[in-house]
């Protein structure tokens, strides 16, 4: 492991070993300990007491963060011609169909989200090898396969994200930027955690939320006390 810089040592010294911080404290502290020269992402890791290998314990969902993600989300709308104007007006960065399908087949993936329609999914199935590994495959459960293309584009642009538990039982996502206020980070974290709580599988036994950590790009993780999620 490389040696810590002076800035990193100072940041590390601000975290009390073994302490679980309130969600408000952690949201303020993550801003203090970030030493990057760019607007780093604020990440959250929630470890769940589930067995993701069992289909009835898979946790997957969508959430619209109250303050957005702080990221510029590049949206491709693969839709029929009659929906193109609606998609463009909603803010889609790329709108079309066959020409973009051919681009993707050739390896183009400079996008963050694809919105499409049920009638078009047959054409998109062949793109699974390219889109699947990158997490770009549209899915009805995440609201990215719909006839209401305009509304779906607006939701994604406003900060809607989809998530799922990984094979180790952790849900990981970015919930903002360090340039956000501590209150904005707290609000986004709270919304994300409460959404996960609502999705608790009925078959999950024991403690559901095992641990919560907040961090930023290249920062140390800050342990959050789950009991404080709804505290101000």
Swiss-Prot record:
GO terms for cellular component: large ribosomal subunit. GO terms for biological process: regulation of translation; translation. Keywords: Repressor, Ribonucleoprotein, Ribosomal protein, RNA-binding, rRNA-binding, Translation regulation, tRNA-binding. GO terms for molecular function: rRNA binding; structural constituent of ribosome; tRNA binding. The keyword Metal-binding does not apply. PANTHER family: 54S RIBOSOMAL PROTEIN L1, MITOCHONDRIAL (PTHR36427), LARGE RIBOSOMAL SUBUNIT PROTEIN UL1M (PTHR36427:SF3). NCBIfam families: rplA_bact (TIGR01169). Binds directly to 23S rRNA. The L1 stalk is quite mobile in the ribosome, and is involved in E site tRNA release. Protein L1 is also a translational repressor protein, it controls the translation of the L11 operon by binding to its mRNA. Part of the 50S ribosomal subunit. Belongs to the universal ribosomal protein uL1 family. HAMAP family: Ribosomal_uL1_B. This is Large ribosomal subunit protein uL1. It comes from Porphyromonas gingivalis (strain ATCC BAA-308 / W83).
């Amino acid at each position: 492991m490389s040696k810590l810089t002076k800035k990193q040592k100072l940041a590390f010294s601000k975290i009390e070993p073994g302490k679980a911080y309130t969600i408000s404290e952690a949201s303020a502290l993550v801003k203090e300990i970030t030493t990057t020269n760019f607007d780093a992402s604020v990440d959250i890791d929630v470890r769940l007491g589930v067995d993701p290998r069992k289909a009835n314990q898979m946790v997957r969902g969508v959430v619209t963060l109250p303050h957005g993600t702080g990221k510029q989300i590049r949206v491709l709308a693969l839709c029929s011609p009659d929906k193109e104007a609606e998609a463009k007006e909603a803010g889609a960065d790329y709108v079309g169909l066959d020409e973009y399908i051919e681009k993707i087949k050739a390896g183009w993936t400079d996008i963050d989200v694809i919105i499409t329609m049920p009638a078009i999914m047959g054409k998109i199935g062949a793109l699974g090898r390219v889109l699947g590994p990158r997490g770009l495959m549209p899915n009805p459960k995440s609201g990215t396969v719909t006839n209401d293309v305009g509304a779906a584009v607006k939701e994604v642009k406003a900060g809607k994200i989809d998530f799922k538990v990984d094979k180790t039982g952790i849900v990981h996502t970015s919930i903002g930027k360090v340039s956000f206020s501590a209150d904005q980070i707290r609000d986004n974290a709270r919304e994300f955690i409460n959404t996960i709580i609502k999705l608790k599988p009925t078959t999950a036994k024991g403690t559901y939320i095992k641990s919560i950590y907040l961090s930023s790009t290249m920062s140390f993780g800050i342990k959050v006390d789950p009991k404080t999620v709804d505290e101000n």
